[in-house]
Swiss-Prot record:
Belongs to the orthopoxvirus OPG142 family. Part of a complex composed of the kinase OPG054, OPG092, OPG100, OPG114, OPG115, OPG142 and OPG157. It is found in: Host cytoplasm; Virion. Coiled coil: none annotated. Signal peptide: none annotated. Late protein which is a part of a large complex required for early virion morphogenesis. This complex participates in the formation of virosomes and the incorporation of virosomal contents into nascent immature virions. Required for the stability and kinase activity of OPG054. The gene is OPG142. Transmembrane segments: none annotated. Its main location: host cell. This is Core protein OPG142. InterPro entries: A15.
């Protein structure tokens, strides 16, 4: 997923699929990245938030905080999980 330079990244586990606006992979957290347990502030310079693997409580906390400070930006949610094939094989009858 491509992440804007003016986005805030909030994560529970760091994803392996983030790229910045120039196409470089963001390998490790940087100064615009926080865990859900850390404190952070939203201001007008932040245009969007990327939530990575949030729990339902994390989503609710972010939504309440966004509403309380009247922040007008976008929230994007990224869920990462293993792609496990089904335990059976699909067979075409033709």
């Amino acid at each position: 997923m491509f992440v804007d330079d003016d986005s805030l990244i909030i994560y529970s586990t760091w994803p392996s699929t983030l790229s910045d606006s120039s196409g470089r992979v963001i390998v490790m957290p940087d100064n615009r990245s926080f865990t859900f347990k850390e404190g952070f502030k939203l201001d007008e310079s932040i245009k969007s938030i990327l939530l990575v693997n949030p729990s339902s409580i994390d989503l609710l906390k972010i939504r309440v905080y966004k509403h309380r400070i009247k922040w007008m930006g976008n929230i994007f949610v990224l869920f990462e999980q293993e792609n496990i094939p089904p335990p059976f094989r699909l067979v075409n009858d033709k």
